[in-house]
Amino acid sequence: MNNTMLEPSPATLDPHLLLPENYKLLLENDLVRVFDVRIRPGEKLRLHANGPSVIYVLNDGRLQHTYEDGTTKVKTAISGAVVWDEAEAHETTNVGDTDIHSIKIELKTT
């Protein structure tokens, strides 16, 4: 196992700093940052970047990611699902009619 430390999200794109009303920090240590993430219906989160993450989805919903190159991807969140999310910069919009609520575990090591 490679324990090389990765840099956390660049400060300028760190969702915890940019979006404190959406990303509540629950835990941080040398290995991970754990967030309670909430996005209201129709809400658009500005460009931000997460490290590689595991997401535990707490309720159903639909969201759209818009990437720096302009491409978009609509994703369906299913309550109880556990999802791997690669490190990348994106905007997120809740395109559904329910709150998006998840726990995001952002890895600091590989």
Where are these regions (language model features)?
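Glycine- and acidic-residue-biased ligand/ion/polar-headgroup-sensing regions
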Residues: N50-D69
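Ligand-binding loop in jelly-roll beta-barrel domains
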Residues: A87-K108
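Short acidic-glycine-tyrosine-enriched beta hairpin
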Residues: D69-A87
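A short glycine-rich, His/Asp/Glu-containing loop-to-beta-strand
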Residues: H16-R46, G51-I55, K104-I105
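Short, flexible surface segments
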Residues: P41, N59, I78-S79
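Histidine-centered metal-chelating micro-motifs
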Residues: G42-L45, A81-T93
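Extreme N-terminal tail/first-helix region
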Residues: N2-K24
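Extracellular/periplasmic catalytic domains that process cell-envelope and extracellular macromolecules
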Residues: A49, K75-T76, V95-D97
